[in-house]
Amino acid sequence: MGKDTIADIITSIRNADMNRKGTVRIRSTNITESIVKILLREGFIENVRKHRENNQYFLILTLRHKRNKKESYKTILNLKRISRPGLRIYSNSQRIPRILGGIGIVILSTSQGIMTDREARRKSIGGEILCYIW
């Protein structure tokens, strides 16, 4: 049975966000680095740094939390894995879904790398729908 690194990163971020943790540590792979760069660029996380421990690289993510007037934390991150190893979901450029009317993003794996739905529509390419983030 193989590991699903995308599901692992999504679950780690979701659990840390629900438990109001400030940081998350995930294993560094090419796919996770691409997804984290998109999350950083879109403003879903604050900071990323690479850490080496016992000849393995890890990414330390600093999550973005929002406080309301009662000084309690409000989670602002919702992630959902779409395509998985047992059921791959593909979409062409015309049928890429919009999340909350464009507020959320769809992360796709295309022939030109991992990118958001807006970039894929602009380049008119489709691919495998990895996850939704809103």
Curated annotation (Swiss-Prot):
InterPro entries on file: Ribosomal_uS8 (IPR000630), Ribosomal_uS8_CS (IPR047863), Ribosomal_uS8_sf (IPR035987)
Subcellular location: Plastid, Chloroplast
Presence of keyword Transport: no
GO cellular component annotations of the record: chloroplast; ribonucleoprotein complex; ribosome
UniProt GO MF annotations: rRNA binding; structural constituent of ribosome
GO terms (BP aspect): translation
Alphabetized UniProt keyword annotations: Chloroplast, Plastid, Ribonucleoprotein, Ribosomal protein, RNA-binding, rRNA-binding
The keyword Plastid is annotated on this UniProt entry: yes
Classification via SUPFAM superfamilies: Ribosomal protein S8 (SSF56047)
Domain of life: Eukaryota
Record PANTHER family: 40S RIBOSOMAL PROTEIN S15A
Subunit-structure text: Part of the 30S ribosomal subunit.
Summary of the function given for this chain in its UniProt record: One of the primary rRNA binding proteins, it binds directly to 16S rRNA central domain where it helps coordinate assembly of the platform of the 30S subunit.
Listed name of the protein: Small ribosomal subunit protein uS8c
Protein species of origin: Lepidium virginicum
Gene it is expressed from: rps8
